[in-house]
């Protein structure tokens, strides 16, 4: 493909509105352009990468018997009313009316549609399992689109749905998808973790998220690609290294979620679901009496602990929530933070939100900072983190402004349900006892759910079993954010290319090192002087030879300065660069492997053999 025929509008500078490096580079390198807020056009390079990722998915899904189809994006609202999600999905749902004033939506996901199609076609267990998927644009009315393709109003998604006679059958397909996802993301060159996830609005029973790990900004060996003029990072002057560090830190660490993972095992979970090893501790032998003490102007845990000269871990934090219109008290030790998702899941609540101080005063008779679990009405449910049960002679609010209780003991002074509702901390022991927990930012790229009968129950999707009894179909749901894969790949494969000029000045510039399977082309063939006939002839020969061997070639035939061509090449990020330059008359070209920065001169007749050795193909 001739570059002069392609739409690749590269920019000389980073876009001013970009905050994450993936957004900046995909715009600057000419992969995408924003049409309006949260809506992007995928230009030829991006489209080629996305199509390659689709090919990987199709190949892996075929192995597990998943069949591709295509459902409409424009959906009748009646289907969503049938499932109950039309009212509960929230403001992200695009709602519209046709000329007859009938209600429609633009689909953000397609559980209802697939359930209806299968409900109307499948009547017996003998017709199951069914494993269907589609690759399609989805729509969500994001309040604040941001970070390029990571938070958009229109996005490309692979959503799959499986249908089963029972949970045992679902478990088999769920495991097939888990392995397929691992194969897909591995082939795509992504550093990812499969983590314990939250079903959220999808209504899942069990779920696993797949997160692309966002690299930190401190490892220079990971970020820098050195030109042949620079032997190693140690040869870069300290002042230049400081400039590089400033440039790296200027970009936000991308990722909407924090991952907690073990340093020594495969354990990994979204921070919302992460837990740690818990071993009950021994309580004090003697319990003190509850005593009310004055704590003037002390509202925070730190203030109370300081005033009473005690360790903060000897205090009970009392929080008030409203869960489905009912008050719920959450108790934690000291400065532990409540994990809203854990609490909501334990309560099986549809809605959970912190109570207002006015509500607290109505229930407790006191404001925030003086709340406690002692002498609460029986109608108030108390959920305590499991660490609270290990406390003895603790301090809690006295439900009177300006006062606290000392000598508070669980079970004797209050009754609670004990469960893990705290947010884990970095450095704590992994729940499997292997290694400690570390945190990283992550981009969600996939999610699999065991939906169970959530949709088949509400929509009447039933089958007759072996005994002629009618049972709801058991479902699974499997999503991959196809368009955000482009962001994740660029986030992980962005690099700073560093070189030294003939005068000894150091230069560095951003670019991409695409993994081979997702690169829009395999080889960037650059002609330094397009007006030189020998160069042109050699370029055409090399292009033909490469294509004959199955290489996809982008040939830069533009009449541009060589510096501009090399700059664009670094931005575009193809794995191999072949330059036809000053030695064209001798048949010699320069080959550069982008990932390592290694360069070598070879004769054109030996180019294919050399590439096979260098790329280990």
Swiss-Prot record:
SUPFAM superfamilies: Class II aaRS ABD-related, Class II aaRS and biotin synthetases, YbaK/ProRS associated domain. It comes from the Bacteria. The keyword Nucleotide-binding applies. GO terms for biological process: prolyl-tRNA aminoacylation. One of its GO terms (molecular function) is proline-tRNA ligase activity. Keywords: Aminoacyl-tRNA synthetase, ATP-binding, Cytoplasm, Ligase, Nucleotide-binding, Protein biosynthesis. It is found in: Cytoplasm. InterPro entries: aa-tRNA-synt_IIb (IPR002314), aa-tRNA-synth_II (IPR006195), aa-tRNA-synth_II/BPL/LPL (IPR045864), Anticodon-bd (IPR004154), Anticodon-bd_dom_sf (IPR036621), Pro-tRNA-ligase_IIa (IPR002316), Pro-tRNA-synth_IIa_bac-type (IPR004500), Pro-tRNA-Synthase_IIa_type1 (IPR023717). HAMAP family: Pro_tRNA_synth_type1. Consists of three domains: the N-terminal catalytic domain, the editing domain and the C-terminal anticodon-binding domain. Belongs to the class-II aminoacyl-tRNA synthetase family. ProS type 1 subfamily. This is Proline--tRNA ligase. It comes from Streptococcus agalactiae serotype III (strain NEM316). The lineage of its organism: Bacteria, Bacillati, Bacillota, Bacilli, Lactobacillales.
């Amino acid at each position: 493909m001739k570059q002069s025929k392609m739409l690749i509008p590269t920019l000389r500078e980073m876009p001013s509105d970009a905050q994450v490096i993936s957004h900046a580079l995909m715009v600057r390198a000419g992969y995408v352009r924003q049409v309006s807020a949260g809506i992007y056009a995928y230009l030829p390079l991006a489209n080629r990468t996305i199509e390659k990722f689709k090919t990987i998915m199709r190949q892996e899904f075929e192995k597990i018997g998943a069949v591709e189809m295509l459902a409409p994006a424009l959906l009748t609202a009646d289907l969503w009313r049938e499932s109950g999600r039309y009212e509960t999905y929230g403001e992200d749902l695009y709602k519209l009316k046709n000329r007859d004033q009938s209600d429609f939506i633009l689909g953000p996901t397609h559980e209802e549609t697939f359930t209806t199609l299968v409900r109307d076609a499948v009547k017996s267990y003998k017709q199951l399992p069914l494993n269907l998927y589609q690759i399609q644009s989805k729509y969500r009315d994001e309040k604040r689109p941001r970070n390029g393709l990571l938070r958009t109003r229109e996005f490309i998604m692979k959503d799959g749905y499986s249908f089963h006679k029972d949970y045992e059958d679902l478990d088999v397909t769920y495991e097939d998808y888990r392995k397929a996802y691992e194969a897909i993301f591995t082939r795509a060159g992504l550093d990812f973790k499969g983590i314990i996830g939250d079903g959220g609005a999808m209504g899942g029973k069990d779920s696993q998220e797949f997160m692309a790990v966002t690299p930190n900004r401190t490892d220079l060996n990971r970020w820098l690609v050195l030109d042949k003029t620079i032997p190693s990072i140690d040869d870069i002057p300290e002042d230049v290294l400081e400039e590089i560090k400033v440039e790296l830190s200027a970009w936000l660490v991308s990722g909407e979620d924090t991952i907690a993972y073990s340093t020594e095992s495969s354990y990994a979970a979204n921070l919302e679901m992460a837990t740690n090893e818990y071993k009950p501790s021994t309580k004090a032998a003697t319990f003190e009496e509850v005593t009310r003490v004055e704590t003037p102007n002390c509202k925070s845990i730190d203030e109370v602990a300081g005033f009473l000269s005690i360790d903060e871990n000897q205090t009970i934090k009392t929080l008030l929530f409203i869960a489905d219109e009912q008050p719920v008290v959450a108790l934690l030790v000291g400065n532990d933070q409540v994990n809203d998702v854990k609490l909501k899941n334990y309560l099986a609540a549809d809605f959970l939100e912190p109570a207002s101080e006015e509500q607290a005063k109505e229930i407790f008779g006191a404001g925030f900072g003086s709340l406690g679990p002692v002498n609460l009405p029986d109608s108030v449910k108390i959920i305590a983190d499991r660490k609270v049960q290990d406390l003895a002679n603790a301090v809690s609010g006295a439900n009177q402004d300006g006062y606290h209780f000392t000598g508070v003991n669980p079970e004797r002074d209050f009754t609670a349900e004990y469960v893990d509702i705290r947010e884990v901390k970095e450095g704590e022991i992994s729940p499997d006892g292997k290694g400690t927990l570390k945190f990283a930012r992550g981009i969600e790229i996939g999610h699999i759910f065991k939906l169970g009968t959530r949709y088949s129950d509400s929509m009447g999707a039933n089958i007759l079993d072996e005994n002629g009894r009618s049972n709801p179909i058991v479902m699974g749901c499997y999503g991959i954010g196809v368009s955000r894969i482009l962001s994740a790949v660029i986030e992980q494969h962005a690099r700073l290319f560093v070189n030294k000029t003939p005068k000894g000045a150091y230069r560095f510039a951003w670019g991409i090192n695409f993994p081979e399977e997702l690169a829009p082309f395999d080889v960037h063939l650059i002609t330094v002087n397009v007006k030189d006939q020998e160069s042109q002839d050699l370029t055409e020969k090399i292009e033909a030879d490469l294509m004959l061997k199955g290489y996809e070639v982008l040939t830069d035939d533009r009449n541009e300065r060589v510096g501009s061509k090399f700059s664009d090449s670094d931005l575009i990020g193809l794995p191999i660069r072949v330059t036809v330059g000053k030695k064209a008359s001798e048949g010699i070209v320069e080959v550069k492997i982008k990932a390592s920065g290694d360069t070598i001169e070879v004769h054109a007749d030996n180019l294919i053999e050399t590439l096979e050795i260098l790329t280990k193909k």
